[in-house]
C-alpha cells in the first residue's frame, strides 16, 4: 500500500528565499582547459559494468589517477548559452581546486601548455573575456575564488593581491564585476588543495583576513563569502564542540575530505577579524564509484539512491552548518557553493533520471531550513553536469531544475506533510505570482505508487524515467524531453487534473493549484 498525500490551498509561510536559489558552477579548469574527472563508459552509466578502483601505482597526487585531460569549454557555444539562459538569472561560480593554482596570464606571457613556477594552469585574457560574455549573455552574477599557491607566495609570507587585482579589475572594466568572492576553494584540505608548501590553518586565517580587507577596501560592492569548506567534523559536533548525538556520522556528506588530512571550520575562522557577508560550505552525498574502494563508508550504491538516509543528507548538512553560520555570520545567508550527488565527479547514474529525485529533494529540503543559494557542480562538466560535456545535450536533471524554476516561487510554505518514505512533499508560492500553491511530491518508493488527493483542479507535471530509472532521458506527462531541431526547448506543459492523482514509483510530480 502506497502513501497518501493530501494537498491544500491554505498553507503557512516559512520564509522567502533568494530568487537565485538554484545556481551553478563552471570549474576554472573548464575555462582554462585541464584535468578533471575521467568520464564513465556507457556500460558503467547503465550499471552493467563496474568502475575499477583507481590505479595509484605511479605515485604522486592520489586524485590525479582519476583525472583525464579536457580542452577548454567553448563558452561562446550557442546551445550552451541558450540552455543556461533558459534557467533564468543565476549565480555563476568560477572556482574549484584548480583555481587556487591558476595564473592570470592577461599579458600573454606564456605559451599554451606552460605555466609559471608554482602554478598549475594559465588563464588567458580571451578565455576570461569569453566567460564574462557568457555571464552577461545569461543574465548571471559572477562569483570567483582566487590564486593562493607557491607561485604567489611562500607559507611564511603574507598573501598579496598582485594576481587577484588583475581578474577583479578586468571583470569590472568589462562590465561584469565580481559580485561575490570566496578566498579559496575548500581550504580545510590544506595539503591537497594547492596551497603553498607547509601551509597551516594559522597561515590561512592571516591570508583570508588580508584578502577580505583588500576586497572591502577596493571593491566594496563585492560580497565576502566563506569559508567554502567540506568539514566532516561539522556533521558530528556543533560550533561549541558538543556532539549532536552518540552515533553522529562524520562521513555522511564529507566526501573526499574524509579521506584526506583536513582542518575544521573553527580552525579556519576562529580569531579572524574580517567578518563574512555570507557563510558557505560544500555538500555531496558522499563519494562516487571512483573513490568507493578508498572510502566505502561514504559510498551509496544505486539501490540506496532514494533511501531516507541518502536523500536526508542535504537537509542534515544544512541544519548542522546553519549553527556555524549563526556563530560566524549571524543574520547572513547560507550558500552551498559546491553541491552534487557525489564527490569525485558524480555517481555512474548522475547523468540519468535516477539523479532527479535527489536533485529536486535537495532544493526543496534546503529551502525549508534556511535562505541561501545552492551552486550545483557543474553546469556542463563531468557526469554530474546538468549538460553533457562537449555536446551540451541536456540531461534529465537539467529539465528537472528548469521545471522547478518555472513553477516554484520564492516563498517557502509548510507543506503540512511529514517527510517519509514514499512521500517527500515541498510547497512554495506560484512562480507566476498568482494566488495558490506550487507543490512538489517525490515518491521515493521503488515499487508503490503514491496517491495525491487534490482539493481542486490542478496543473500536473509528472516526471518519470524513460522506461527505467537509469534512463538517459526523462518523460514529462509521458512525453520525452529532448531538444527540438534547432535546439528548441520542448513544451513544459502541465495537464489539468482533479480528484486523485498517482505519482509513479520514483516519480517526481509538480502540482500547481
PLM-predicted stretches and their roles:
Residues 352:
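Ligand-binding pocket segment of bilobal, Venus flytrap-like solute-binding proteins
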